Amino acid sequence: MTTDFTPWPEALAAQYRQLGYWQDKTLLDYLQQSAERTPNALALVGDNQQWRYQAMLERIEQLAAGFTELGLGCGDNVVLQLGNVAEFYLCFFALLRQGIRPILALPAHRLAEIRYFCQHSQAKAYLIDGAQRPFDYQALAQELLACCPTLQTVIVRGQTRVTDPKFIELASCYSASSCQANADPNQIAFFQLSGGTTGTPKLIPRTHNDYAYSVTASVEICRFDQHTRYLCVLPAAHNFPLSSPGALGVFWAGGCVVLSQDASPQHAFKLIEQHKITVTALVPPLALLWMDHAEKSTYDLSSLHFVQVGGAKFSEAAARRLPKALGCQLQQVFGMAEGLVNYTRLDDSAELIATTQGRPISAHDQLLVVDEQGQPVASGEEGYLLTQGPYTIRGYYRADQHNQRAFNAQGFYITGDKVKLSSEGYVIVTGRAKDQINRGGEKIAAEEVENQLLHHPAVHDAALIAISDEYLGERSCAVIVLKPEQSVNTIQLKRFLHQAGLADYKIPDQIQFIDQLPKTSVGKIDKNALRRRFDTLGLALMS
């Protein structure tokens, strides 16, 4: 029997409650507390909408009643794929209120990923944006209905263009009926998505208790309060802008979230000046772009207190440059959707902020740095990071075999990150052990792309490697061996991957053709040799 959810051991759960980490409240309870304190305070701005706390809460309750009337109930799974719009949070909280579990798909996900989420979770509904651009999600939903038998309803923000009665408009879901909240703080609240190293992203089950602790502790560390004005330019469904402290942290503190569907500095700087933004979260490529643009920008960015950078390693040189370029403090963030989050603290020295990725949220976060044999390394030595704690999951959803590889016998999560741990407990990220490309914060599993390439009739063998990129940190390069007397070009291969339903960010940035892939002494593809051959920028930086 497949395990849906791996709970924390009872002794640990009891300890976390005794310490006050787990409050046995739902995520909606924290929003309700803010609505009670400051009902008329501005909570959310975006897409020509403004929501004050009490009005937002009432709208969430109306949606919750409407979702219940659709036949969705506690324990049902729903794929939620909305961008940076107010309805993302309204739907998120409404589903949580009823114990309905949203899978937080990203706007960039396409057929291959969404089909897997629906089939693996037996999702009953798919919630999407009705706009045709930049992507037609309604057309995707029609494909899903043909291959996902549990999918009963497609809920569309905006207008439906499909006559199928399974398509309904979100606007019709608001109900004046009352319904009893049905969420359990100890059970799965929603699903985040893993970066993945073995194909399609795994589902990460987060409970109300563990996630709420992560957010509330982050609020304290980052000193969010009712005066916080947070600009969300990264995809709202990402763990980083959702909970570190992210939008949820702003709601908990009684501040205001300003949404932007455009992350460009030209647009974002205008919003910073207009709304007196105090904090935002960026991935390294975006931070570099903003820094470059700030040098010639005339917008007033003086309201910024600090900018968070995470999702991928931020170079020391860039970290030292940011405070002067943007006129505010840098906070480095190193975290994962599976749990563990590290922050540099706001009162840390400039040297610590520039040279480390922070230290953990909790005194009860356990970090182990081990060698290839699983033995602890000396302080300051490089090794592989393992972790467990009050907000780090104990297993992926319905993934027993993968869990045996991803967690050790003591329940520690094997992160796949190579790090050093300082004597003060600060983490310095040095690399990755997993076969994964971190493209500007978007994680790409090499195996997933390789498997799709191998389905092409002209491809004999394929390897996907990471190569250095000045802005993205890493980009992807597919190295292809063709079958005898077969031919295919780069454009045709990329089109093939698009047609297979891969997300755009997974399409290789570069494709190289060679006669034979190099092998190690045990017959595995030697990706280090491929990187040495094709990563010209990385070699230049090392020389």
From Swiss-Prot:
Q: What is its EC number?
A: 6.2.1.71
Q: Which gene encodes it?
A: vibE
**Record-annotated membrane-spanning stretches:** 240-259
**CDD domains associated with the record:** 23DHB-AMP_lg
Annotated Gene Ontology cellular component terms:
plasma membrane
Cited function? Activation of the carboxylate group of 2,3-dihydroxy-benzoate (DHB), via ATP-dependent PPi exchange reactions, to the acyladenylate, preparing that molecule for the final stages of vibriobactin synthesis.
Pathway it works in: Siderophore biosynthesis; vibriobactin biosynthesis
Instruction: Name one process (GO BP) from the record.
Output: siderophore biosynthetic process
Q: Using the record, list the residue span of the signal peptide; answer none if the entry has no such feature.
A: none
Main localization is membrane
Q: Which family does it belong to?
A: Belongs to the ATP-dependent AMP-binding enzyme family.
Gene Ontology MF terms: 2,3-dihydroxybenzoate--[aryl-carrier protein] ligase
Give the PROSITE patterns listed for this entry: AMP_BINDING
Please name the InterPro entries in this protein's record.
AMP-bd_C (IPR025110), AMP-bd_C_sf (IPR045851), AMP-binding_CS (IPR020845), AMP-dep_synth/lig_dom (IPR000873), ATP-dep_AMP-bd_enzyme (IPR050237), DHB_AMP_lig (IPR011963)
Instruction: Indicate whether Transmembrane helix appears among the record's keywords.
Output: yes
- This chain belongs to the protein called Vibriobactin-specific 2,3-dihydroxybenzoate-AMP ligase
Q: Is the keyword NAD assigned to this protein?
A: no
Compartment(s) of residence: Cell inner membrane
